[in-house]
Amino acid sequence: MTTSSRLSRILWFAFAVLVLAGTAAWGYRVATLPSFEDQRNVVPLSTVWGMHACLVAVIAGLAGVAMPLGRILGRRRCLTALGLAVAGYLACGLAPGITRIFFDEHIYAQIGQTITHTGRAESANYARVEYGQFEMYSANINKQPNGLPYLLSWIYRIAGVSDASSHFLNRALVGLAAAALYLGLALVPWKLPAGAGLAAALLFIFTPLVLWWGHTVAVEPPAAATVAFAFLAVCAHARLRDPETAQGLPASGLLLAGATAFAVYFRPESLLVFPLVAVVLWSTDDRFIEDLSAWGALALATALAAPNLLHLWSVRDESWGARDGRRFAFDFVEKNLQSNGGYFFDSHWFPIAGTVLAVVGALWLLGRNRTAGVALATWFAMAWGIFILFYAGGYFFGASSRYGVVSCAPVAIFMGIGVAALFGLLRRVPVLAGGLAACALINWAAAMHYVPTMSREAVEAQADVDFIARVAPTLTEGSVVLSPDPCIWLLKGINSSQIFTLDEMVHTQMKELANQFPGGVYLHWSFWHNAEPTMAAESAKLLVETNAIPIARVQCQAYKLGLFRIDTPEALARFGGKEPAPPYHDTDLDKMLARARAAQVPAKPAPAK
């Protein structure tokens, strides 16, 4: 190793440590703010800037290693990776482009809308969105990390806010994740059977659960994809290390730091990407602990992930829906293990052929490359096993199956190794190989039966989303809708608020509210009104008190949905409050015509002849 290269590594490590020290000082400053609310208010901006920094690190690092990686991979592998990315995007079109988690996916998209216009990662309790502008009146910090909304914000900046642009992202990420797995396995210095990388990438794409969730706006496909990118980055760093000294390049360390930190911003358990990176480095060279560039990557990745750590700390008291407050406990293991383990054997979500291939791959690694097997088993154990401890981590319902997507990448690698190993073993027995391949394809195709479907538990909620999509274009400009789900209306370009946010104004200043929104004040009788009796009773009372005017109604199963106008004459008389201040120049057409007619001098009658 030359003196200059050693110096560059020392400078890289010093830079990373300096950034980490600066981040620690910033964290201490935030921790000493006078109130918890002040500390929490830092989160919406700091998380966005943290992800900006991650992208800068990734792009800069990639620029530094593009040439050596290009020489190693060659044109054929690069074109194959491009083909996999396109194939993954197109394959996700087999599933319907809908939302399956109600209404988390709309919250993610609406936060992306907010980031687009304000640069802050907040969901809107009350906002005005008209004429391409967005104005936040009442914000809320979502408990989930903001990686998905951040990526959506870039799509929205380019293509605008729409269902099509929202669903484009996950489809693209599925394809890119497959390409990352292929390139990572091409780069990692593991001994693997020929063709394992390509087989793993294709099997990842056509994993039924990946396709089913790949055409939604759920966070699990991006979470899986960003961990796959981190896997690619660590494989690149391991491949570019000096084989004699085990020292990595600063540029690949920068890429590794940015990719690892960025993966943290998608789900709370995404923090487990750190031990994944460590075990992959160990599996490629047990001298990894001597790699100064890797230590620099760890320091910088920790600094880049700090804003998300602050976010998670700020929502530490959230129940996440756990009725007794226990989010993780060993008491959930038995029940969750039945469903999550059964995923591989009951042929409901996953083909049994895939399980057989994964077992073959694991056995091949056990005999030929145990360190690689340990690394992949660790990845799977963390990505799949963490949900066994989670109170809602079992695949009991269609929506819960999304957690299985997070572990699909390591399972696909095991399957890919299994396919490649069997092909190498049976290629001289084509009849047997063809018969086994046909059986596997039949089983796989049969397991994809649910890919083009929705799911029963989502029907009523999807009907509410469809109802909003149909009604929103009929509302006039300057309207506002009170709804338990303002995010959906805001995404459709309609001003909206949580009911509780404007409740006092509705009951005391209806005239002022109607003055601010001359297009009308509306109440959305939603999916939640059918599920929450207290909310339904309060809204029904308001509709009666205002003699609300029905605008649209629809029924799905036993759920009734509707939109009502509540700024009626009765509402203005009962809840009107103080008259709004008159405009400085009153130029209303009808008023001006009335004044002109009143001021007109009657014409003199014509003289009698």
Question: Where are the predicted features?
Answer:
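Hydrophobic/aromatic-rich transmembrane helices and adjacent perimembrane loops
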Residues: 44, 50, 109, 213-214, ...
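Hydrophobic, aromatic-rich transmembrane alpha-helices
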Residues: 58-69, 177-182, 281-283, 348-377, ...
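Transmembrane-helix signature of polytopic, membrane-embedded enzymes
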Residues: 181-206, 224-225, 245, 427-437
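Multi-pass, polyprenyl lipid-linked donor-dependent membrane glycosyltransferases
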Residues: 103, 168-173, 199-229, 234, ...
